């Protein structure tokens, strides 16, 4: 994750201080940023959010947009309760951090310059481990920015 430069030129180095840590995902930039309590950016990286339409479930599956809080975390053993559809779950979601209903931030081995998930925010495994173990705690604010208007 230290070599992943995605997002460094997109996210500002500082944002208004809130007194709380923040994780921000920008679907338009395929990137995330972590900000400390003082509003200083401490890390950025590549991310992939939910795609416009998921064939296997027959509906749109973009990541929910808005401001949320992490309410549950799991470690390397975390698995989906829904996907893949054909097995009604079991898909690996290492270092998952739940922020709204079933939406999580979790590790993935593919983090393309595209939004390709069923709604979760996928980040590189080393980034997910760092976020889960070193940065995000229960109550950390998660901000999902809007998708591009024409996508």
Question: Locations of the language-model features?
Answer:
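Exported/periplasmic cell-wall-interacting domains
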Residues: 2-20, 58-67, 72-151
